[in-house]
């Protein structure tokens, strides 16, 4: 009797879990929370490698909001290298003002609190993963309506867990790469929405 009760409970639980996993809203929540759990261990990291160049030792970022005009005017490394030829001190130019402006705003409010910088990096990576899920589901829905969500869910989890992203998420400076892909995915989603709206 007890064995049958356990077996029935097991299958009911599996059925409930199965229904949750194929539920699109639940998948969205998981896709957002999974990277947070995956990279939670980076929250206690300090600034490392290029984080010092773009945040901690960058004169323009450490000025906070008042450094934004110089961030917009000069190469990314200028605030760190403090020389007129900063663009040539390192091979190739590095004009990436968006992330430095974001860092300046964060620095204005929390200073050198690496925990907050790492937390924001993980949150933006989670938003990127959610956006990738939405894009894949939208692209697959017309050809594979029954499988679009599960395929998108698994593909996004694979993307989130791939070790190649560790450097981007664990180093705060990697936010420029997260932003690049995230804004590209958002642009693609907007294009698809515009196409759908024009069909109506």
Residue ranges and their predicted role:
Residues 3:
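Cationic, low-complexity basic patches in intrinsically disordered or flexible, solvent-exposed regions
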Residues 7, 12-200:
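Polytopic membrane enzymes that build or remodel cell-surface glycoconjugates and lipids
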